[in-house]
Amino acid sequence: MRKVKPARKLGRTAAHRRATLSSLSTQLILHKRIETTEAKAKETRKVVEKIITKALKGTVHAQREIFKDIRDKEAIKTLFGEVVAKVGDRPGGYTRIIKLCPRFGDAAKMAVIELVDFAEAPVAAPKAAKQDRAKRVKGSKKVTGDVAPAVAPVPSAPAETQEEAKAPESAE
């Protein structure tokens, strides 16, 4: 009887899928954070978690096993040097997936996958203290309390005379 396999096929052949996941894993190790589709991120997480767990052993055999999946020497150096040093005491859960808004072109579900210990919080610029408008606008005066503004009263306009009201406008 046919059984369902738990992995996503990602619309690729087996070799293409393996190459895609290898490439995504390599880039994640090198850059610590990548943006991809949600399905690829979830499959990449499985691969990277296993790779980092093997790397924590630190043996030559582990290096050779990992080199089967990641065929990039720089990524291997980064993995065994930088990554293992930071996640050495963590028992698992080395990656985090953050969902993003859908991609504009095809509305594919997007996500960011990142290594947890390398996630940097965005640095917010310190907000400048809000100044009073009087200090910002040169030469202005701030009105305080119940003081009425210093505005001169406008004299009322003279009312229309009866002659002006009776005279119809002539068409010229």
Swiss-Prot record:
GO cellular component terms, A-Z: cytosolic large ribosomal subunit
Keyword Ribosomal protein: yes
Region (Disordered): 127-172
Cited SUPFAM superfamilies: Prokaryotic ribosomal protein L17 (SSF64263)
GO biological process: translation
Keyword tags: Ribonucleoprotein, Ribosomal protein
MF-aspect GO terms: structural constituent of ribosome
Cysteines paired by S-S bonds: none
One Pfam match: Ribosomal_L17
Family recorded in the similarity comment: Belongs to the bacterial ribosomal protein bL17 family.
Assembly: Part of the 50S ribosomal subunit. Contacts protein L32.
Protein name, as recorded: Large ribosomal subunit protein bL17
